[in-house]
């Protein structure tokens, strides 16, 4: 399903009280960090608009907005690497979403467990 983020969502969309708190970027999106609920492992960063957050909250599966494909995607629908939502929270500025999930398989499209496994940067001395 394709749509434009930030466009007027359907009437059944995100709770207005939650929507009023969100601080979105100019593109209508907020960063969404997926974290393994029981280990604290940071898995990936995706993007959500109001509709993606609504779907995540109501279906129990993470829905993201693909900036490259300009469409919604549910993590695991293609790969089988599903993110089952355990909790969702806003940060103190309400400009980032933390989604605690139970990750099945790899979180990264490369096949790695997380999107942060492959490219650790050296620290200066």
Swiss-Prot record:
It comes from the Bacteria. Its cofactor is Mg(2+); Zn(2+). The keyword Aminoacyl-tRNA synthetase does not apply. GO terms for biological process: L-histidine biosynthetic process. InterPro entries: PRA-CH, PRib_AMP_CycHydrolase_dom, PRib_AMP_CycHydrolase_sf. Transmembrane segments: none annotated. Its EC number is 3.5.4.19. One of its GO terms (cellular component) is cytoplasm. GO terms for molecular function: magnesium ion binding; phosphoribosyl-AMP cyclohydrolase activity; zinc ion binding. NCBIfam families: PRK00051.1. This is Phosphoribosyl-AMP cyclohydrolase. It comes from Streptomyces griseus subsp. griseus (strain JCM 4626 / CBS 651.72 / NBRC 13350 / KCC S-0626 / ISP 5235).
